[in-house]
């Protein structure tokens, strides 16, 4: 009942960029016609000491606003079964800023505070559409990443001569490693701080692009693998380095050192940054590898077919947890999707209950014995074809994807 009652109406653009450059939203207007696309560039920024203080204040205020109205929504529903809409929350926040107790909210970007309310509203909408995403949680200073989003209105955000101008912050030095085309329109910026203390700005642009939808001729099926990221329908697999597994012992050793140090000491803070940098290195190595693999596939094929896997459920599995996290299937899928769409190509997801591993890709016979995951190779009892479990599954996924595209 609560899920049906707490539905809001406002939506927002949230930066989900994992890389330096990403198409985060694509809208086709028709075959061979113009395409409206959003592209996000992620640049490192170097704030001065005064700007770092302002960023810290903004992170804190955004978190406080989110938590305050999350509590407000929950209490109102418990009292009279009604919802507090985004509009009501925004009006209450405007009044709150005029009080002496909450006057500090005026010191930070007002749009960032509004975006925090929109993010809360979106979190509820996502929960109502898909309860498995989980009920919105209160944000913690320690648990959550420091970040806030702001929107470009009347030129309040600009990039010029190696500097990014942000509301209330001013000119922040920017490491711009890519040229931004003149026709790109700046839409929003998400500022974030990593656990190691680095600052980044993910800048979202909108642009018009003429993309000719490709004729689907070259199909590829991918079966995600615990050992080598995936096996494709041609029998190939990438030589995937297990970055987290390789760094696990070193991470554990440094984490033990951190746990033994006195809280609040300078040495503990130095060790905390050291551990954070190790995690960042693993993450960056994984992203680099996944970007290169997804680029090779997107350039070589017109349509890529994969299984629609439940990544969260697999991560919670006792047997699959570390493998799923280390492989980064979800991230790889995201990278592959936007790279294909940018070229007018497609990523097709096959139903997760499709029996790709049990079905013979030659004659269609279903072999129930293959439900045993330990069975890596098998011979079809009907046609006698010898199968590698993963390659056979990838071929079936490709064939099912072709059927869906041509249906």
Q: PLM features: what roles do these ranges have?
A:
Residues 14-407:
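Nucleic-acid substrate recognition interfaces
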Residues 1-15:
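Single conserved hydrophobic/aromatic residue that forms the stacking wall/gate
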């Amino acid at each position: 009942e609560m899920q049906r009652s707490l539905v809001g109406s406002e939506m927002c653009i949230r930066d989900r960029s994992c890389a330096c450059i990403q198409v985060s939203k694509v809208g086709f207007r028709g075959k061979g016609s113009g395409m409206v696309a959003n592209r996000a560039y992620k640049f490192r920024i170097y704030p001065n000491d005064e700007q770092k203080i302002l960023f810290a204040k903004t992170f804190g205020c955004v978190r406080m606003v989110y938590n305050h109205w999350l509590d407000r929504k929950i209490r109102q529903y418990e009292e009279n079964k009604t919802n507090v809409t985004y509009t009501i929350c925004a009006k209450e926040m405007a009044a709150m800023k005029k009080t002496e107790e909450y006057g500090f909210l005026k010191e930070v970007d007002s749009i960032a505070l509004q975006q925090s309310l929109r993010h809360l509203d979106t979190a509820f909408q996502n929960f109502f559409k898909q309860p498995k995403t989980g009920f919105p949680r209160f944000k913690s200073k320690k648990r959550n990443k420091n970040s806030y989003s702001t929107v470009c209105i009347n030129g309040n955000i600009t990039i010029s001569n190696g500097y990014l101008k942000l509301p209330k912050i001013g000119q922040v030095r920017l490491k711009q490693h890519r040229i931004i085309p003149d026709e790109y329109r700046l839409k929003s910026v998400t500022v974030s701080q990593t656990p190691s203390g680095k600052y980044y700005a993910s800048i979202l642009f909108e642009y018009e692009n003429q993309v000719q939808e490709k004729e689907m001729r070259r199909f590829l099926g991918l079966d995600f693998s615990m050992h080598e990221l995936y096996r494709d329908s041609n029998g190939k697999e990438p030589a995937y380095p297990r970055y987290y597994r390789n760094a696990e012992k070193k991470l554990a050793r440094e984490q033990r050192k951190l746990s033994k140090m006195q809280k609040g000491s300078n040495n503990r803070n130095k060790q905390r940054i050291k551990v954070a940098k190790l995690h960042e290195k693993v993450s960056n190595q994984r992203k680099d590898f996944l970007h290169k693999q997804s680029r090779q596939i997107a350039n070589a094929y017109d349509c890529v077919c994969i299984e629609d896997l439940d990544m969260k459920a697999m991560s919670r599995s006792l047997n699959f947890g570390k493998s799923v996290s280390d492989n980064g299937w979800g991230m790889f899928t995201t990278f592959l999707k936007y790279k294909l769409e940018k070229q007018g190509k497609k990523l097709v997801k096959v139903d997760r209950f499709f029996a790709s591993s049990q079905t013979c890709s030659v004659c269609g016979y279903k072999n129930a014995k293959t439900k045993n995951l330990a069975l890596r190779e098998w011979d079809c009892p009907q046609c006698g074809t010898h199968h590698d479990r993963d390659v056979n599954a990838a071929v079936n996924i490709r064939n099912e994807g072709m059927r869906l595209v041509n249906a």
